[in-house]
């Protein structure tokens, strides 16, 4: 039986590594004054009239939505409705960012324009975030098992135990990160996630804490593949996640491990 959530052509490496996907994208401003519980943001959505999963993305400590805007547009162009948010203050801590990601999902479903609301399948939601936004992503995933996917990017959180998470989670770390070093953040976060869930750990080679703030082929490719696989239940994308990218010398990926198959 055909998957009703499949969107777009059969995927290839070239399609996933390109700066934009197959869908034309429109955008809509979410005013800080109209946003309840977060600092406003920008919604990117496919122009094609259909229903799509929805994704909320938080920036990191001291960051604004501009630091993750490229991800909003990139992911929307593959068939998702995406909001990149400003936080209430740029100094908000991870657990505050979790609440704001949740508020942003609610905003898209209930308060955005009809063009946005009519395109969202509210049963298929996901969250992403950079740095403290990645910590917020983990926190919300631990609180909302109904989420379909979570992607923390070079995440930072004081809590190291995420064994309560039941959401398919892709953690992306960076080997040269000195702000949230993988040895004390991304790796122990991944290791603490239960082996019973679909999870993966991708460590970028030669990359710093701020790798998610500029267009990155690897982050874009594997974030889209993860969202497609778990928000859209689209098994055409499993080929990119299992066995996943090769790691080692002279590659763009330092390490990749997962609970494949999924």
From Swiss-Prot:
Annotated poly(ethylene terephthalate) binding sites: 61, 132, 156
EC number(s) on file: 3.1.1.74, 3.1.1.101
Active site, per annotation: 131 (nucleophile), 177 (charge relay system), 209 (charge relay system)
Biotechnology: Shows promising applications in ethyl alcohol distillery processes as it may be utilized for treatment of molasses wastewater. Has potential for application in biological recycling of plastic waste products.
Gene Ontology cellular component annotations, sorted alphabetically: extracellular region; periplasmic space
One Pfam family, short name: PETase
InterPro entries given in the database record: AB_hydrolase_fold, FrsA_esterase, PET_hydrolase/cutinase-like
Disulfide bonds listed in the record: 242-260
Predominant subcellular localization, coarse grouping: secreted
UniProt-listed SUPFAM superfamilies: alpha/beta-Hydrolases (SSF53474)
Outcome reported for the amino acid change (mutating residue 65 to E): Decreases activity on poly(ethylene terephthalate)
Listed Gene3D superfamilies: alpha/beta hydrolase
GO molecular function terms noted in the UniProt entry: cutinase activity
Catalytic activity, as annotated: a butanoate ester + H2O = an aliphatic alcohol + butanoate + H(+); an acetyl ester + H2O = an aliphatic alcohol + acetate + H(+); (ethylene terephthalate)(n) + H2O = (ethylene terephthalate)(n-1) + 4-[(2-hydroxyethoxy)carbonyl]benzoate + H(+); cutin + H2O = cutin monomers
Cell compartment(s), UniProt: Secreted; Periplasm
Keywords tagged on the record: Disulfide bond, Hydrolase, Periplasm, Secreted, Serine esterase
Protein family: Belongs to the AB hydrolase superfamily.
Role summary: Catalyzes the hydrolysis of cutin, a polyester that forms the structure of plant cuticle. Shows esterase activity towards p-nitrophenol-linked aliphatic esters (pNP-aliphatic esters). Capable of degrading the plastic poly(ethylene terephthalate) (PET), the most abundant polyester plastic in the world. Capable of degrading the bioplastic poly(lactic acid) (PLLA).
Protein name: Cutinase 2
Source organism per UniProt: Thermobifida cellulosilytica
Gene from which the chain derives: cut2
């Amino acid at each position: 039986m055909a998957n009703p959530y499949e969107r777009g052509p059969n995927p290839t490496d070239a399609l996933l590594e390109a700066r934009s996907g197959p869908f034309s994208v429109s955008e809509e401003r979410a005013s800080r004054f109209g946003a309840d519980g977060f600092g406003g943001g920008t919604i990117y959505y496919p122009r094609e009239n259909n229903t799509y999963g929805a994704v909320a993305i938080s920036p990191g400590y001291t960051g604004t939505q501009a630091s993750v805007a490229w991800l909003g547009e990139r992911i929307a162009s593959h068939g998702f409705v995406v909001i990149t948010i400003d936080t209430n203050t740029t100094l908000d801590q991870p657990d505050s960012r979790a609440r704001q990601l949740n508020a942003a999902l609610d905003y898209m479903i209930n308060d955005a324009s009809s063009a946005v609301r009519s395109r969202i399948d509210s049963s298929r939601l996901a969250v992403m975030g950079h740095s403290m936004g990645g910590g917020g992503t983990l926190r919300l995933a631990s609180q909302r098992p109904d989420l379909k996917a979570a992607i923390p990017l070079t995440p930072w959180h004081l809590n190291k135990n995420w064994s309560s998470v039941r959401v398919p989670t892709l953690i992306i770390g960076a080997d040269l990160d000195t702000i949230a070093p993988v040895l004390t953040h991304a790796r122990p976060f991944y290791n603490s996630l239960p082996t019973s869930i679909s999870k993966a750990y991708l460590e970028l080679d030669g990359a710093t804490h701020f790798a998610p703030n500029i267009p990155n082929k690897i982050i874009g490719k594997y974030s889209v593949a993860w969202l497609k696989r778990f928000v859209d239940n689209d098994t055409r994308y499993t080929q990119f996640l299992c066995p996943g990218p090769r790691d080692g010398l002279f590659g763009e990926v330092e390490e990749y491990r997962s609970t494949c198959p999924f």
